[in-house]
């Protein structure tokens, strides 16, 4: 098992489990990218309902919780990544602030089980970027208030 760290917030510096590169299709988003993304979001994360689609190890959603999100829904279909994600949620003690959905993102959206979210993160597998599924995620955003704007972040490597 490898590890990555939570960058900032209440869990800043804590290590999260991550798979060894050869053991899974999951590759956590790099620390520099996560840091830049969360610096861009700033205080919008405070109290937010967040969706971490294609969650992998949960590094992005757990960073969101660390920085003040109220709740994160993680959606991940890979069984190895799900186990690591579940262990990471437990190790930080955020079971009441997190919900893990074990399903492909597209199937979960189409099942009607998805709610509405303030912020959505999508980091699909590089070899299967699932652009049509990512575009469906826009429909899960809560409508912004007059003073808000919505941003969408998707990492393409």
Protein language model regions, located:
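Class I S-adenosyl-L-methionine-dependent methyltransferase catalytic core
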Residues: 1-151, 157
């Amino acid at each position: 098992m490898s590890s990555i760290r939570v960058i900032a917030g209440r869990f800043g510096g804590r290590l999260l489990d991550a798979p060894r590169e050869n053991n899974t299709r999951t590759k956590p988003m790099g620390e520099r990218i996560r840091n830049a993304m969360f610096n861009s979001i700033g205080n919008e994360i405070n109290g937010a309902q967040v969706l971490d689609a294609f969650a992998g190890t949960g590094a992005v959603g757990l960073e969101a919780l660390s920085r003040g999100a109220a709740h994160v829904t993680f959606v991940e279909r890979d069984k190895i990544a799900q186990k690591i994600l579940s262990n990471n949620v437990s190790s930080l003690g955020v079971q009441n602030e997190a919900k893990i959905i074990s399903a492909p993102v597209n199937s979960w959206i189409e099942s009607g089980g998805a709610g509405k979210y303030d912020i959505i993160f999508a980091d699909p597998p590089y070899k299967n970027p699932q652009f049509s599924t990512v575009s469906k995620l826009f429909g899960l955003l809560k409508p912004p208030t007059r003073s808000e704007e919505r941003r969408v972040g998707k990492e393409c490597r």
